[in-house]
Amino acid sequence: MASIPEERSAEHRARSYQLEMFEASLKGNIIVVMGTGSGKTQIALLRIIHELENSDGKLIWFLAPTVPLCLQQHRVISQHIPAVKSRTLLGSDKVELWTEQAVWDAVLEGLQVIVSTPAVLHDAMTHGFVRISRLGLLIFDEAHHCIRKHPTNMIMRNFYHPALQEYGPGAVPRILGLTASAGSSREGLQTIEMNLNSVCTTPQAHRQELLEYTHMPELRRVLYTPLMKENASLWEGSTLQKLLERDNTYCSGQMKTFVCKAVHIFQELGIWAAEYFIRASVEELLSHAYVHSKIDLDYDEREYLVNILSKSPVPDIDVHSTDPKDFPVSPKFEALISFLMSTEDINFSGLIFVEQRAAVTVMSYLLSTHPSTRDRFRTGSFIGMSNSTNRKTMLGDLLSAKMQPDTLDDFRYGRKNLIVATDVLKEGIDVSACSVVICYNIPKGFESFIQRRGRARRQNSTYSMMLSTEDDGSTLDKWQKFEKIMEEACLEDRRRTEELRALGSLDEDVCTRFCVRSTGAILTAEYAMQHLVHFCDTLPRQNYVEDKPEFSFERNDGGLLRAKVILPSSVNPKVRRAEGKAWWKTERAAKKEAAFYAYKALYEHGLVNDNLLPLTKSREFTRKDISLLPAVQKVSEQYDPWVDWAHLWSSTNLYQNRILVRQNEEDTSMKFITPTATPPIAPMKLCWDSETTYTLEFEAAGAVSLTAENIERMRAATSLYLQATTSTPLAGNKDYIALFGPDLPWDELETWLKKNQGHEPAIQVFSSQRPLDRMGVVRDRSRYGELLIFKRWLNRSGDLELECDPYPSKRRNLLQRQTLAKKRPAEDEILGSPTKKRILSASHCTIDRLPASETVFGRFIPVILDRLEAALVATRLCETVLRDIQFQDLRHVITAITMPLAQAPTDYQRYEFFGDSVLKFTVAASLFYNNPNWHEGYLTETLHALVQNARLTRAALDQGLDAYIISNRFTPRKWSAPLISEKLYASASTRSMSAKVLADVVEALIGAAYIDGGLHKAQSCIVRFLPEIELPETKLPRPESMPMSKDHKKPHLIQQENLENHIGYTFKDKTLLMEALTHPSCPYDTSIQSYQRLEFLGDAVLDMLIVDLIRAHHVECQQGEMTKIKHAIVNGHLLAFLCMQFKWAMPSPLTPSIDTGTETETEIISPPPKTLSLYSYLRYSPSRPLPLHVEPESGSSNALTRHNLLCPSILHALNNTTAYPWSLFSAIHADKFFSDVVESIIGAIFVDSGGDLGACAGFIERLGLVRIAKRILDERVDVTHPTQRAQIELQKLAARLGCNDGFRFECRTVRDLSSGKRKTLEVDINDHYGDEDPAVLGAEGPELTYTCTISLATLRTNQDFGRDLDDIVVTGCLSKEDAEIQAANLVIELVGRLESGRLYKKNMDLDIDTGVQVDLDLDMNLDPGITTG
């Protein structure tokens, strides 16, 4: 079988001819006949995956002719299908000793794929341990062996065909054969077809593509002069021969075989090689004479053999000589050296096939030692792995089977470039395509000839035969015949290629046409192809995926073609596949017709618009009236509720409210008269000073009927309160909008006014001995009536004085604790503090009659009215714009419409954070459910268009929300009581407002609705502002469910139950889980869309889950902190890490343990379990596997390797440290699909559960995300991104140094210059980090690295540092973010050292090698590749 080719095609998907063969295998039993290196393994993998995903529970048995090939194919299957339960069954497992059915049942239990040699399966079936009915699929690698008495044919003859004849096709497995040589004659081909009950098949519709990947080598003859007959027959008739033939003991047999091998090596390679063989064999025997596992002879035989050979003379050879004459070799080997030295390929890689195992070892050693070849060729040897533990013929067997895998690996990775091997390497073994293949001995048959030739599959390669000049002619004629066959085959292929090219120039007229009536747009077959390619170019880009239409063809009996096109897997399955209807002479015409029908289907399913163009952001997704919105809007002035109240005073209906004032344990109260019922007002906490707070509670309003006299008295009382707290006389008008007074019966109000209005001279108050609790505010007339708080009287030197404290400033907002005044300390603490205590002459002062304990009401009135105004604005908003939302708690609305500029107790920033996620979630779900045909690209573009600030700004303006946004700042010093006379004649005006504020308030209201009444109320609020949003019916089945999904009992996914158990959710629609695990590169299942749509939905669901977790936390965080926390929890780094961590053990296949002493006791042992991960279940392209396995031999490092290295440090940081491990995450640089699959599974659970967020929360809790999130919240982990912190630190430092210039993070990509490519990318630190780095997309190879430079030119202008301070440079990073984080960490450390005064000009020196400043005095423990100033 052709191994997986080393060359990587530019197309990272299954080739068309491979898909043609795969689809043919689904229709019936076939034998795939394709050349070596054409990729038959891919076909087998596709067939195995299909069988597993449509499994009936039967075994898949893969038969390979040799042990190395079995091991190789099992490795390939395990790497490409990690979730499969598979194992090998080989002779080394001692299967011949498994003599009980219970042993076989235990071994095979739970397995899905078995790889073995044919003999193992034949023996098991012969003894009845494995029945043919238990097999679902039989794969025959190197199917041409299925003839005569070969075990493969015995399986078919003795078990398959009898069962087929007796029970029918349902009782036997499906057959897939793979071969590069189906036979040398038509009769042989028919025999193999009959034996395997299959039809030999080779690509027909895509033969031209197959020819592009298979290269016929040039056949060359290497002639040599044979040995003279007298030298060749030295052994015959010798004394040694007679002696050995006379005895017939086991030792004589060993010696006879040994001598025959030595003579063969002498004849083939020469005397030096024979002497080396004898010497090395004797040394090998003596060194392992008493090791049981190496030589299995009894004691006497061993002693006898050792005694003979230890006394025999051993040839002395010189292996270090530089003179070729010291290496006498045979003429045949001389011809080989001459041929090898004539090759001039600098990338030489070659194979030499020899006949005997012993000759392999000796020739390899001779080539690596001979002066002519040892410096040019790096030689290895390979004899296979069939060394049995019971082998007793060990004398002269020099090569250990344990060395074989190393030889092949060395050859694959270029550490060796020439391999000497037996025929074991001619079939299937995965080796690099060779430039030279040499048959040192003539192949024994046509199949061997073809198989050896298949190793020379590099372009312009050579296939050489070693032929004797004295050959009788028959052998040469035979190979000349074969050479002619090869030449004719090449010519036939060339003729076929020329015919196809000639047909390609034929211009067939494809007369298909489609017209869109609404626009007149026309689609024709002539331009359909470029339309289709353009559509594919607009699909979302993904690494490991090439988004382009894939065409395949079928050919009818008349040789005409019909095309089929398959679009990338991100396209809906309904339109992903299209076929032509007519038959054509040329592929060009067939492709045009298929492209026409494909594009027409895209239009019919709404994937292109009426202009027959892909939907774009500028047309379908965005309203035209939002693109022209300026950044600053002219909007309505803030709604003034006092205007409405001024008009309501004309009515006789009044309402009385009661305000309860609590201070410590003392309660007082006030009356509050309004012209209408007031909305509920939340209790207020007013901060008088650092130790004194008042709590105001409002009782419900009740209607009251007041006389004109009482209204006037309430106005007087209101004026009294307001005047009591200001030194400025009030205006004459007292028609206040709201009236305040003492909580007294109405008939006592006039008495209260008379008692408390006005003031008295301080001297008079002193004379009347007014009680201290009735003492009013002191006014210093010498200082314009400055207000003071009376403390005590002082009568010193006959002058009456007052000791007072300053009255709290009117500038202070009592709602804000940060502006608290300090309470007056104890008297013994202020004796030396004249700024606090005031001593005034009584003659300059007056004292108000209103007690100071009641004057505080005058300070409360502005605060009460300010909060009442906010409540009235919110109430009016709820009665108009939000009339359908029905908020329960008005405080949420007040918070949502209050700008930070207003400096109110709350503002919209926190609610905007919640609303943003709720909006994104709702719109994403709506788009997902209501547009089942749209791919992820359309969904993402539409989501961004609907939730962008411009759209929300337009929604706010359309609904008139601008008038209800509270921007007026409450300033107590400038505040004046609203008057009826002023408000009656107020005129409308406008104000300027940022468009972003309007958008933020919309999101804040959505957040307020979410907090007030949950998700349903929030979504009602969304529809109010964005009526185009159709709320999704999440309880209904997804509209795009495939017919497969109706069969819920069928296990469509490999090991699905195991996966569902660990996810913690059992899917009702199994295809949803398949879709969630289908990578966009998956080519073989056109009925399932890739996971991108579900990942789009899951991303929004995850945001919603984390936001709900943050909201429910007992500690309230500010908006900026919540944003950083959410980013730390849902970022792709953490999700990818948790995906890699999400592992569990799958029990390995059981293995019987045999007691080799008795060979009777069998114990079933369980090997270490196989580890499965979430990513093990990904369905992807076998032709370009995702990097899910560590291959250290390749010299490269993938994300899993880096994860294994950094995992302990990351876990320690996540569980113990106070800082988030941004640097460690960026160093892993995980591929995006690791995080994508987590989000796609969340999306799949959400859809399958009918929108149950709890089910999704259960999965992320199992994943470990909830635990990490709770620790971040509970322990206040610092989640600030290093680049943000570095920018802040640099800006602070620049400000302190008086520098105006900012700092810039400059990032560029650097390719290895040997690749001939170079890219440069400069990125500002504030740039958005996308899912993929721009330079990574389409990049190949590990040579792409990033360098980040942070210019410190601004600092160099400062005299404290001078010009010796150089820029910070970080090199060799795998991603842009990693480079910037590494540089940012150095900036943070550098700034700290600069500010501490430890780093100065005298400490700096220039690194000559790098040209970059380094700190000679600091131990900074930098990573390799990092230099710093």
UniProtKB/Swiss-Prot annotation:
Q: What class of enzyme is it?
A: hydrolase
What cofactors does the UniProt entry give for this protein?
Mg(2+); Mn(2+)
- Coiled-coil spans in chain: none
> Where ATP is bound, by residue?
34-41
Q: Which GO terms describe its biological process?
A: defense response to virus; regulation of defense response to virus; regulatory ncRNA-mediated gene silencing; RNA processing
EC numbers listed for it are: 3.1.26.-, 3.6.4.-
Under what name is this protein listed? Dicer-like protein 2
At the highest ranks, the source species' classification is: Eukaryota, Fungi, Dikarya, Ascomycota, Pezizomycotina
